A protein has these predicted regions:
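Active-site substrate-recognition loop segments, prototypically the cytochrome P450 B′-helix/B-C loop
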Residues: 1-132, 141-159, 163-165, 172
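Cytochrome P450 catalytic core segment centered on helix I
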Residues: 148, 157-207, 211
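Cytochrome P450 core scaffold surrounding the K-helix E-X-X-R motif
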Residues: 303-311
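Conserved cytochrome P450 K-helix E-x-x-R motif and the immediately C-terminal K′/meander segment
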Residues: 250-287
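Cytochrome P450 heme-thiolate "Cys pocket" and heme-binding signature region
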Residues: 310-376, 384-389
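Cytochrome P450 catalytic-core helices
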Residues: 214-221, 225-250, 330-350
Length: 389
């Protein structure tokens, strides 16, 4: 799952897995790191909703993992909602949900526009751009900094730490980068509170310690930057390559909302995640799952499971792209709004935008967890800058 071959065509790999193994597949997440990949939809729902038998706490597992394992920064235990179980999970989850629920979605709509327009103006007169490095990433980064109340100087260090985590840099180095930057943010927000997630986490009755606060913010950025950037880019790829979205098929062209819903079903940006660790050997679908070995939900493969996939995506929210059960994403409304608005801003400004190469020439970044393009070159008629109000 970490190979370039898998990244190039994971759906072929999932089909072969299903043919050979059924709903549960033995895989390696990294060389010498075994796991079970869940590719059956109903099996995934069952496991995700059974935290007593399948907790998300990896501490026993990681004792057997070398410190230099490249996926350790992604999976190691942290005192946050994503990597905890039981009462710990409930405490962290309540604090995170309250902090996220405090986001003003109407104001967020305006915030996306305020970021998108200046970004578009940096390349609209060139007639060409890379939508990953020049639009999707900087927009996602700026919006998340705004939501977190994070100034640009601290945010730059956070972005570096996040990139290091997804690229498999040494766990101690990743944690040092994050720890320093996010401690600075927490110190700032204690002195200058605002209408932001960091301030709300600080004020929550859970009374989170500094290390806990840092790790809630690690989750915010980890679940935000890379997956949200990829959601935008992959949806744009669908809209730029499928004739339906270009209005070349009779009838009304599907909307950005339709494209997002379809993409979340067919090719979700966080393709394999929702990791749990069985407390004891557990028999599922005739397969014994070893105790404390990672069980990874393939949201991508499960969504495309022939048992449930009928090709109807309109107002269909049964996909697993946001996860399900007690660890389901609490910020899906925020992510959906940001992606929808960012895509609309770009296509409204540059309606004749198209890929600068054929889709099969695009390079997908290797990695067991994400579905991510390395670059997304586009061309368009040169356009004057947009007016910023």
């Amino acid at each position: 799952m970490y190979s370039e071959e898998f990244a190039t065509d994971p759906h072929h790999a999932y089909r072969e897995m299903r043919r050979q193994y059924g709903s549960l597949v033995p895989v390696e997440l990294s060389p010498g790191v075994p796991a079970t990949l869940v590719i059956g939809y109903h099996t995934a729902v069952r496991i995700s909703n059974d935290p007593d038998h399948f907790p998300a706490d990896p501490r026993t597992w990681q004792q057997s993992v070398p410190a230099d394992c490249p996926i350790l920064p992604m999976l190691e235990w942290r005192p946050n909602a994503l990597r905890s179980a039981g009462l710990e999970h409930a405490r962290y989850r309540q604090a995170n949900a309250a902090a996220i629920d405090g986001i003003d979605l109407h104001a967020l709509h305006s915030a996306v526009e305020e970021v998108a327009v200046p970004l578009i103006n940096t390349f609209c007169e060139d007639g060409a751009a890379d939508l990953i490095s020049q639009y999707a990433f900087p927009l996602t980064f700026a919006v998340l900094n705004s939501i977190a109340g994070c100034p640009p100087d601290i945010g730059q260090q956070v972005a570096y730490g996040m990139a290091a985590m997804f690229e498999g840099v040494d766990a101690d180095k990743v944690n040092a980068i994050f720890g320093g930057a996010l401690f600075d943010l927490i110190t700032l927000k204690r002195a200058e509170p605002g209408d932001d997630i960091t301030t709300r986490l600080l004020a929550h009755p859970a009374n989170l310690a500094d290390a806990e606060l840092i790790n809630q913010l690690v989750t915010l950025y980890g679940a935000g930057i890379e997956p949200l950037q990829n959601l935008m880019a992959n949806t744009l790829l669908l809209m730029l390559t499928d004739p339906r979205f270009a209005g070349n098929v009779p009838g009304a062209a599907p909307s950005t909302k339709d494209a997002l819903n379809e993409l979340l079903f067919t090719d979700p940006p966080l393709a394999n995640f929702s990791v749990t660790y069985p407390r004891q050997p557990t028999l599922i679908d005739g397969v014994w799952l070893p105790a404390h070995q990672p069980v990874v939900i393939s949201m991508s493969a499960c969504n495309n499971d022939p048992a449930i996939h009928d090709g109807d995506y309109t107002d269909n929210h049964s996909h697993l792209a946001w996860g399900t059960g007690p660890h389901a994403c609490p910020a899906k409304s925020v992510a959906y709004l940001v992606a929808n608005n960012a895509i609309d801003q770009l296509l409204d400004a540059l309606p004749e935008i198209r890929l600068a190469c054929s889709a099969d020439q695009l390079v997908w970044r290797p990695g067991a967890f994400h579905r991510a393009l390395a670059t997304m070159p586009v061309v368009f008629p040169k356009s004057p800058p947009l007016t910023v109000f």
